């Protein structure tokens, strides 16, 4: 399972990516429906914030829902010393909920993923490439909250990964590799190539 993490620990590899726009046409034509994107809220993630994300997503994707019952953040994924949760652990649990739909977990807690710099390296989001499963946090590792605009872009980035997109070389695309930084201010949309790939997956990006 190839896992992509967003910002502060973004490690996707283009050699492992699905080629953009190369899905056989006969496969595309067989798709009668697209998966619903289900937003799962952890603990006290604000309903108003979830609704904002859902409305933004509905502008580019035809089937979006917010699950009514919140999920509980598992204690076994909590790191007390750093006061943050394992993003990879949450991702593994979310995969079990997929059942044919796309799943995105939403949390207000800081999440982490081990890398060469730290076993509890803070990240903004994590997804499993091409499996339609991901999780994002509205709280940065610094403890500051994302603006609504940046949170929407983070959501689009992780969903792009989960639908099969790897990082993009276009510095103004949602899918650009943040390289341990924050490039949201320079990414207004998906580039034409990434947009075409997602539209072949059922998205409605104009």
Task: Enumerate the predicted regions with their spans.
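C-terminal motif of bacterial Sec signal peptides marking the signal peptidase cleavage site
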Residues: 6-9
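Bacterial signal peptide processing site
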Residues: 11-13
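Metalloprotease/metallohydrolase-associated module, dominated by Zn2+-dependent proteases
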Residues: 27-29, 43, 120-150, 166-206
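Metzincin-family zinc-dependent endopeptidase catalytic domain
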Residues: 47-154, 166
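Catalytic glutamate of the conserved HExxH
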Residues: 154-162
């Amino acid at each position: 399972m190839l896992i992509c993490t967003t910002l502060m620990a973004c490690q996707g590899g283009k050699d492992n990516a699905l080629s953009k726009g190369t899905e056989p046409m006969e496969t595309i034509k067989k798709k009668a429906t697209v998966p619903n994107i289900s937003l799962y809220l952890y603990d006290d993630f604000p309903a108003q914030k979830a609704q904002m994300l859902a409305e933004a997503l509905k502008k580019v994707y035809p089937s979006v829902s917010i699950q009514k019952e919140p999920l509980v953040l598992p204690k076994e994924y909590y790191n007390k010393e750093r006061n943050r949760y394992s993003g990879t652990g949450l991702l593994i649990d979310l995969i079990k909920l997929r059942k044919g739909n796309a799943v995105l977990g939403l949390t207000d807690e800081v999440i982490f993923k081990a890398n060469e710099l730290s076993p509890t390296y803070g990240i903004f989001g994590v997804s499993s490439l091409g499996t339609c499963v991901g999780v994002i946090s509205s709280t940065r590792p610094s403890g500051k909250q994302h603006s609504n605009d940046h949170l929407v872009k983070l959501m689009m980035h992780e969903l792009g990964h989960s639908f099969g997109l790897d990082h993009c070389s276009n510095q103004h695309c949602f899918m650009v590799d943040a390289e341990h930084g924050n490039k949201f201010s320079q990414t207004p949309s998906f580039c034409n190539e990434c947009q075409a790939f997602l539209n072949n997956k059922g998205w409605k990006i104009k």
